[in-house]
Amino acid sequence: MFILWYSASSTFGKDSDIVMGVRAQQKEKTRRSLVEAAFSQLSAERSFASLSLREVAREAGIAPTSFYRHFRDVDELGLTMVDESGLMLRQLMRQARQRIAKGGSVIRTSVSTFMEFIGNNPNAFRLLLRERSGTSAAFRAAVAREIQHFIAELADYLELENHMPRAFTEAQAEAMVTIVFSAGAEALDVGVEQRRQLEERLVLQLRMISKGAYYWYRREQEKTAIIPGNVKDE
């Protein structure tokens, strides 16, 4: 009898685990639907601040009251979107660096990948741009954190590839990211030919920064090898 009871309880436990697993999957699916619904409603004319909970819930196919099972409020949804946008971009750039390792121009491959991201995920980039200087301190901090992650990863790569001190690679990475985001803002709502021209201009600008960083580093190295006072600062 004990064996029968143990067997039955064991089966019940497994069934319960399966049910819990299905519920967790369904909850994650609904949460995903809410995030995608919010992204789909952003546009050149519409910012995140103008979205309403009811609109997002309706687009996701759930009742407005069910929204709170997944997010405390609309702001938490927005912060999740910022995190996802930054992570998406960083993952794509990591993939670009993997392609570079197999051969190809570092800067051109990176720029092409970035422009692909904007073309495929315009609203994700719009969110980062707008909330970077928005009215919410929490959103500004979240975007700044994502950009800093992006700069840090690029600085790591430059340090490894160019064998320059961290101070140089961080300055170079910050300059590059600033220019890239500026070009991205221009590329959001232009045609194919204009985007191609922007891409070429961005490649040139990044190459100039890269060359400038390298020669500045060489100059600093040469200065340390010469007696102080013998080199005129430019």
Swiss-Prot record:
Regulation: Has been suggested to require either an unsaturated acyl carrier protein or unsaturated acyl-CoA (but not their saturated equivalents) for DNA-binding. Another group suggests that unsaturated thioesters are not essential but act instead to enhance DNA-binding.
SUPFAM superfamilies reported in the protein's UniProt record: Homeodomain-like
DNA-binding stretch(es), residue numbering of this chain: 52-71
Phenotypic effect of disruption: Significantly increased levels of unsaturated fatty acids (UFA). Double fadR-fabR deletions have increased levels of saturated fatty acids, suggesting a functional fadR gene is required for fabR function. Increased transcription of fabA and fabB.
GO molecular function, one term: DNA binding
Protein's UniProt keywords contain Transmembrane: no
Record-linked InterPro entries: DesT_TetR_C (IPR054129), Homeodomain-like_sf (IPR009057), HTH_TetR (IPR001647), HTH_transcr_repressor_FabR (IPR050692), Tscrpt_reg_HTH_FabR (IPR023764)
A biological process from GO: negative regulation of fatty acid biosynthetic process
Keyword Repeat included in the entry's annotation: no
Annotated localization: Cytoplasm
NCBIfam families: PRK11202.1
Function as written in the Swiss-Prot or TrEMBL entry: Binds the promoter region of at least fabA and fabB, but probably not yqfA. Represses the transcription of fabA and fabB, involved in unsaturated fatty acid (UFA) biosynthesis. By controlling UFA production, FabR directly influences the physical properties of the membrane bilayer.
Misc. comment: Probably part of the fabR-yijD operon.
Subunit structure: Homodimer.
Name assigned to this protein: HTH-type transcriptional repressor FabR
Species for this entry: Escherichia coli (strain K12)
Lineage: Bacteria, Pseudomonadati, Pseudomonadota, Gammaproteobacteria, Enterobacterales
Gene it is expressed from: fabR
